[in-house]
Design a protein with these regions (language model features):
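Exposed, interaction-prone extracellular/peripheral surfaces
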Residues: 2-48, 64-69, 78, 87-100, ...
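A positional/architectural concept
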Residues: 52-56
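Structured adenosyl-cofactor binding patch, chiefly the S-adenosyl-L-methionine
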Residues: 126-129
Length: 310
């Protein structure tokens, strides 16, 4: 049974994705959307400033120096060779590489109310992919779960889009793997991304960032130096707050690793630990000047965006 967002954008099962779900976001490709929730660094940043990097500038040609030209763009090698001052001319890049890092690892295979975080992540990645295609930019990225990874070099038009959507469908699994592969950690994928990206790229990181640590932060610093990064955190309400009945009764929890109980009154400790964990994630991106947008798996994706007034 499909859960209709609006128009023809469906969530089918909520535990995995099918290609037609992701293709349906074509109808949103021309909308100038903004997340309803402000980015964390905009709310908390203080003295940290976000880096705003526009499209890169490509070298076009060299011409004779003219009065008023910026001396910083004089081509000194041509000037020395010809004996006359020459200036470099640049134009804005016609297309820009866009990379999406899509985390579908085991911690993302969770959802308490609407869909799994992994499913919501795929829908968000699809929305960003379609808008990338609409702008005429090239799309590449990395899609990974706990045992597999797809590394996609940027391609233009529909080729980059369809490859990315296909890999998203294939790697979005219904249940966690019984044996996890440490070589597919977030840190490993960020290192892979640092080798894949091209200077001046736009990068979208889609994850719950449960594996974010100091080593990841060092790699982010390197990537962020010459690129524009947006971080998208996918979360579920149960990760932040236990159900109300857990305040008075024991709450049984089951997983592949076993089962157990939350003791009565454990809700406060659980909430405090969750808040501390979230604060660390927020602070990591604040220090990097990277916008952190928050998307919840308990609501349809498009309800978490709005079209800004012109």
């Amino acid at each position: 049974m499909s859960i209709a967002l609006f128009d023809n954008t469906p969530y089918r099962t909520g535990v995995d994705v099918q290609l037609n779900e992701l293709l349906s976001y074509k109808q949103q490709e021309k909308l100038q959307l903004q997340p309803t929730a402000k980015a964390a660094y905009q709310q908390l940043a203080g003295n940290y400033l976000a880096k705003i990097k526009g499209r890169g500038m490509e070298f076009a040609e060299v011409r004779h120096y003219q009065p008023g030209d910026d001396v910083r763009i004089i081509d000194w090698s041509v000037t020395a060779r010809t004996g006359k001052a020459h200036t470099k001319l640049f134009h804005e890049e016609k297309e820009r590489p866009v990379f999406i890092l899509l985390d579908l690892s085991d911690s993302m295979i969770f959802g308490s109310q609407f869909v799994f975080k992994s499913v919501q992540a795929c829908h968000l990645a699809s929305l960003l992919s379609w808008q990338t295609k609409q702008r005429g930019d090239r799309l590449g990225g990395i899609v990974f779960n706990q045992q597999q990874v797809a590394e996609l070099k940027p391609r233009g038009r529909s080729k980059g889009l369809m490859r990315f959507l296909h890999e998203s469908e294939q790697l979005c699994v219904k249940q966690p793997f019984k044996q996890s592969d440490a070589s597919q950690s977030l840190l490993v994928q960020l290192k892979r991304l640092s080798r894949l990206v091209q200077t001046g790229s736009q990068i979208h990181l889609i994850s719950d960032f449960s594996q974010l640590d100091d080593a990841c932060q060092k790699i982010l610093t390197l990537i962020n130096r010459h690129n524009q990064i947006n971080a998208w955190q996918i979360s579920d309400p149960l990760e932040q707050l236990l159900p109300q009945h857990a305040l008075k009764n024991q709450l049984q929890v089951n997983s592949l690793q076993g089962s157990g109980f939350f003791k009565r009154g454990a809700s406060k400790d659980y909430q405090d630990a969750a808040s501390l964990r979230q604060q660390k994630i927020d602070n990591t991106f604040i220090k990097q000047g990277i916008p952190l947008y928050k998307v919840c798996a308990s609501l349809p994706l498009m309800e978490q965006f709005h079209v800004p007034a012109r």
